[in-house]
Amino acid sequence: MHNVQDIYADEPIMLQFDLPKNGLIVVGDLHGDLYCLLNILLKNGFPPNAKYLFLGDYVDRGLYQVQLILFIFLMKLRWPNYITTLKGNHEDYQCGKEYDFYNECLSMFKRGSRWFTQINHVFDHMPVCAIISNQSIISHSDHFFVCHGGISQWMTCRSNVGNIPKPTYTSNMHFVEGVILADLLWADPKLEQQKWFDLSRRNCGYSFNRDALNIVLRALKVKTLIRGHEYYPGGTTRNFGDDTCYTVHSTTDHQELYDPFCKFLIASQ
């Protein structure tokens, strides 16, 4: 556990890297669905034959929460340059207590409370977003901004995001840094919303419309937002009907029957 935490501690809060020539497999919310993860890996290949980026929400709700997150940690240890994992809103101490990840740890381990605390220490060292360049395109802008939730009205430049401190204990942050972090983990796009930014129905973070997204994308010098956080029956969706915002949710809705066709997005040149 300490070894994988050390890897994350060396990574910046906002990753920046080039899009692989053979593409990048983007995996959305898994929520303890180990079968879904294995299906995606079997379909696309294990590293180093493929590179993966995970959008967060590995725990809570599913049947194999502990097994899934430990498996992802093992993959990160084995292939650190081929596995990128971002923090989601459920990778949080309080959220894990309110849902069922804490109880899963208690049932799995003799000292479950310690395991829960240690895993959350690892979560707090994870990066929360990434900027991905497409070197095959000559442009003054990078291609993708990737996070779990969405954008913030305070994201006026990249340094506003890159200066968020790790580990991500909000008590160690300035107010604006905490607000940006909350939006990165909790924000949602809303097609019919009139205001650029409005209070989220989730009681944390803000929702944003197309105009707000375009302004923030220009400020960050990127063209497309890729995010998770929301379930859609098709697994992926273009939130505004164009290429400015994609949502990826890999596991099925846990209120529905088991769906063997796990969803993912391939970001390619």
Where are these regions (language model features)?
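Feature recognizes metal-dependent phosphohydrolase scaffolds
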Residues: 1-269
